[in-house]
Amino acid sequence: MVVAIDGPAASGKSSVARTLAQRLGYGYVNSGALYRSATWFVLEGGLEARAAAMAAAHAFTPAPGVEPDPSLFEARINAHVSAVSSVPEVRAVLTEKLRSFADSVPGVVMEGRDIGSAVFPQTPYKFYIDASLEVRAQRRAGQAGAGSDDLQARDRTDSTRRTSPLIIAEDAHVIDSSRLTIDGVVGEIIGRLKLKGLAVA
Protein backbone atom coordinates (compact mmCIF):
# COMPACT_ATOMS: atom_id res chain seq x y z
CA MET A 1 0.00 0.00 0.00
CA VAL A 2 1.48 3.31 -1.11
CA VAL A 3 0.67 6.85 -0.03
CA ALA A 4 2.16 9.12 -2.69
CA ILE A 5 3.33 12.60 -1.73
CA ASP A 6 4.48 14.83 -4.59
CA GLY A 7 5.34 18.49 -4.92
CA PRO A 8 7.98 21.01 -5.96
CA ALA A 9 11.24 21.72 -4.13
CA ALA A 10 10.92 23.11 -0.59
CA SER A 11 7.14 22.67 -0.48
CA GLY A 12 7.42 20.85 2.84
CA LYS A 13 6.63 17.43 1.40
CA SER A 14 9.60 15.69 3.03
CA SER A 15 8.69 16.78 6.55
CA VAL A 16 5.05 15.96 5.91
CA ALA A 17 5.79 12.53 4.43
CA ARG A 18 8.17 11.61 7.24
CA THR A 19 5.68 12.64 9.94
CA LEU A 20 2.80 10.92 8.16
CA ALA A 21 4.76 7.67 7.93
CA GLN A 22 5.42 7.80 11.66
CA ARG A 23 1.73 8.40 12.40
CA LEU A 24 0.65 5.52 10.16
CA GLY A 25 3.42 3.15 11.19
CA TYR A 26 4.53 2.85 7.57
CA GLY A 27 7.94 2.93 5.96
CA TYR A 28 9.11 6.27 4.55
CA VAL A 29 11.12 6.72 1.37
CA ASN A 30 12.48 10.00 0.02
CA SER A 31 12.85 9.16 -3.66
CA GLY A 32 14.62 12.44 -4.30
CA ALA A 33 17.50 11.27 -2.13
CA LEU A 34 18.19 8.51 -4.66
CA TYR A 35 18.44 11.01 -7.50
CA ARG A 36 20.57 13.31 -5.38
CA SER A 37 22.86 10.41 -4.54
CA ALA A 38 23.20 9.62 -8.23
CA THR A 39 24.02 13.28 -8.89
CA TRP A 40 26.67 13.28 -6.17
CA PHE A 41 28.17 10.17 -7.77
CA VAL A 42 28.36 11.94 -11.14
CA LEU A 43 29.97 15.08 -9.73
CA GLU A 44 32.46 13.26 -7.51
CA GLY A 45 33.50 10.73 -10.12
CA GLY A 46 34.16 13.20 -12.90
CA LEU A 47 32.74 10.63 -15.29
CA GLU A 48 30.55 10.95 -18.35
CA ALA A 49 27.20 11.97 -16.94
CA ARG A 50 24.94 9.32 -18.47
CA ALA A 51 27.25 6.39 -17.69
CA ALA A 52 27.92 7.59 -14.16
CA ALA A 53 24.26 8.23 -13.48
CA MET A 54 23.35 4.75 -14.70
CA ALA A 55 25.99 3.18 -12.46
CA ALA A 56 24.69 5.18 -9.50
CA ALA A 57 21.07 4.26 -10.22
CA HIS A 58 21.95 0.57 -10.12
CA ALA A 59 24.03 1.01 -6.95
CA PHE A 60 21.59 2.88 -4.73
CA THR A 61 18.50 1.35 -3.15
CA PRO A 62 15.68 2.82 -1.03
CA ALA A 63 16.65 3.04 2.64
CA PRO A 64 13.47 3.66 4.65
CA GLY A 65 13.96 5.69 7.79
CA VAL A 66 17.47 6.80 6.86
CA GLU A 67 17.81 10.56 6.61
CA PRO A 68 19.58 11.89 3.49
CA ASP A 69 23.08 13.24 4.15
CA PRO A 70 23.02 17.07 4.38
CA SER A 71 25.68 17.24 1.65
CA LEU A 72 23.07 16.03 -0.82
CA PHE A 73 21.35 19.41 -0.49
CA GLU A 74 24.39 21.52 -1.34
CA ALA A 75 24.07 24.11 -4.10
CA ARG A 76 26.14 22.05 -6.54
CA ILE A 77 23.77 19.12 -6.17
CA ASN A 78 20.76 21.40 -6.56
CA ALA A 79 22.24 22.75 -9.79
CA HIS A 80 22.62 19.34 -11.44
CA VAL A 81 20.08 16.97 -9.92
CA SER A 82 17.32 17.76 -12.39
CA ALA A 83 19.61 17.03 -15.34
CA VAL A 84 20.61 13.67 -13.89
CA SER A 85 16.99 12.92 -13.03
CA SER A 86 16.01 13.60 -16.63
CA VAL A 87 18.04 10.69 -18.00
CA PRO A 88 15.30 8.19 -19.00
CA GLU A 89 17.39 5.13 -18.18
CA VAL A 90 18.14 6.46 -14.70
CA ARG A 91 14.46 7.05 -13.98
CA ALA A 92 13.58 3.60 -15.31
CA VAL A 93 16.06 1.87 -13.00
CA LEU A 94 15.12 3.87 -9.90
CA THR A 95 11.40 3.59 -10.62
CA GLU A 96 11.73 -0.19 -10.68
CA LYS A 97 13.68 -0.12 -7.41
CA LEU A 98 10.96 1.98 -5.77
CA ARG A 99 8.22 -0.36 -6.99
CA SER A 100 10.10 -3.44 -5.83
CA PHE A 101 10.58 -1.91 -2.40
CA ALA A 102 6.88 -1.05 -2.09
CA ASP A 103 6.00 -4.65 -2.94
CA SER A 104 8.16 -5.85 -0.05
CA VAL A 105 6.46 -3.91 2.76
CA PRO A 106 2.86 -3.66 4.06
CA GLY A 107 2.73 0.11 3.69
CA VAL A 108 4.96 2.99 2.67
CA VAL A 109 4.75 6.76 2.39
CA MET A 110 6.85 7.73 -0.60
CA GLU A 111 7.62 11.28 -1.63
CA GLY A 112 9.06 12.81 -4.76
CA ARG A 113 7.96 14.56 -7.92
CA ASP A 114 6.37 11.76 -9.93
CA ILE A 115 5.31 9.20 -7.33
CA GLY A 116 1.58 9.55 -7.93
CA SER A 117 1.78 10.45 -11.61
CA ALA A 118 4.33 7.90 -12.87
CA VAL A 119 5.74 5.53 -10.25
CA PHE A 120 2.46 4.47 -8.60
CA PRO A 121 -0.34 5.89 -10.77
CA GLN A 122 -2.67 3.13 -9.53
CA THR A 123 -2.59 4.14 -5.85
CA PRO A 124 -5.78 5.86 -4.71
CA TYR A 125 -3.83 7.74 -2.05
CA LYS A 126 -2.20 10.65 -3.90
CA PHE A 127 -1.34 14.06 -2.49
CA TYR A 128 0.38 17.08 -3.99
CA ILE A 129 1.96 19.49 -1.50
CA ASP A 130 2.59 23.03 -2.71
CA ALA A 131 3.46 26.41 -1.19
CA SER A 132 4.04 29.96 -2.36
CA LEU A 133 7.40 30.73 -3.94
CA GLU A 134 8.22 33.12 -1.09
CA VAL A 135 7.58 30.51 1.59
CA ARG A 136 9.49 27.86 -0.34
CA ALA A 137 12.50 30.18 -0.70
CA GLN A 138 12.48 30.81 3.05
CA ARG A 139 12.41 27.08 3.74
CA ARG A 140 15.16 26.22 1.28
CA ALA A 141 17.37 29.03 2.63
CA GLY A 142 17.66 27.03 5.82
CA GLN A 143 19.08 24.12 3.82
CA ALA A 144 21.30 25.52 1.12
CA GLY A 145 20.75 29.24 0.75
CA ALA A 146 18.74 28.91 -2.45
CA GLY A 147 16.60 31.88 -3.44
CA SER A 148 13.39 32.25 -5.41
CA ASP A 149 15.27 32.44 -8.72
CA ASP A 150 16.88 29.06 -8.06
CA LEU A 151 13.53 27.52 -7.19
CA GLN A 152 11.85 28.99 -10.26
CA ALA A 153 14.60 27.57 -12.45
CA ARG A 154 14.22 24.16 -10.81
CA ASP A 155 10.45 24.30 -11.25
CA ARG A 156 10.86 25.04 -14.96
CA THR A 157 13.32 22.21 -15.45
CA ASP A 158 11.25 19.70 -13.48
CA SER A 159 7.95 20.56 -15.13
CA THR A 160 9.23 20.65 -18.72
CA ARG A 161 11.50 17.60 -18.84
CA ARG A 162 10.37 14.85 -21.19
CA THR A 163 10.70 11.99 -18.72
CA SER A 164 8.28 12.00 -15.77
CA PRO A 165 7.80 15.77 -15.49
CA LEU A 166 6.50 17.36 -12.31
CA ILE A 167 2.73 17.43 -12.74
CA ILE A 168 -0.30 17.15 -10.51
CA ALA A 169 -1.90 13.74 -10.96
CA GLU A 170 -5.55 14.07 -11.99
CA ASP A 171 -6.84 12.36 -8.85
CA ALA A 172 -4.36 13.90 -6.40
CA HIS A 173 -5.57 15.99 -3.47
CA VAL A 174 -3.72 19.33 -3.53
CA ILE A 175 -2.71 20.99 -0.27
CA ASP A 176 -1.19 24.48 -0.01
CA SER A 177 1.16 24.29 2.96
CA SER A 178 2.11 27.99 2.93
CA ARG A 179 0.18 28.80 6.10
CA LEU A 180 -0.09 25.34 7.59
CA THR A 181 2.07 23.57 10.13
CA ILE A 182 3.42 20.11 9.41
CA ASP A 183 0.84 18.65 11.78
CA GLY A 184 -1.85 20.64 10.02
CA VAL A 185 -0.97 19.17 6.63
CA VAL A 186 -0.62 15.66 8.08
CA GLY A 187 -4.00 16.00 9.76
CA GLU A 188 -5.63 16.97 6.47
CA ILE A 189 -4.03 14.00 4.71
CA ILE A 190 -5.16 11.58 7.41
CA GLY A 191 -8.67 12.97 7.13
CA ARG A 192 -8.66 12.30 3.39
CA LEU A 193 -7.27 8.81 3.89
CA LYS A 194 -10.12 8.00 6.27
CA LEU A 195 -12.65 9.30 3.75
CA LYS A 196 -11.14 6.93 1.19
CA GLY A 197 -11.68 4.02 3.56
CA LEU A 198 -8.16 3.53 4.87
CA ALA A 199 -8.10 2.31 8.46
CA VAL A 200 -6.09 4.87 10.42
CA ALA A 201 -5.54 4.59 14.16
Regions found by a protein language model. Name each.
Residues V3-I5:
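Hydrophobic anchor at the beta1->P-loop junction of P-loop NTPases
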Residues G7, E111:
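The Walker A (P-loop) glycine that initiates the GxxxxGKT/S ATP-binding motif of P-loop NTPases
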Residues A10-S11:
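ATP-binding Walker
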Residues S14:
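Walker A/P-loop
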Residues A21-S31, E44:
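Post-Walker A helix-loop "phosphate-sensing" segment adjacent to the P-loop in P-loop NTPases
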Residues A33-G107, S117, L133-Q138, A146-S159, ...:
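ATP-dependent small-molecule kinase phosphotransfer cores
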Residues P124-Y125, I168-G184:
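Phosphate-binding beta-loop-alpha motif at adenosine-nucleotide cofactor sites
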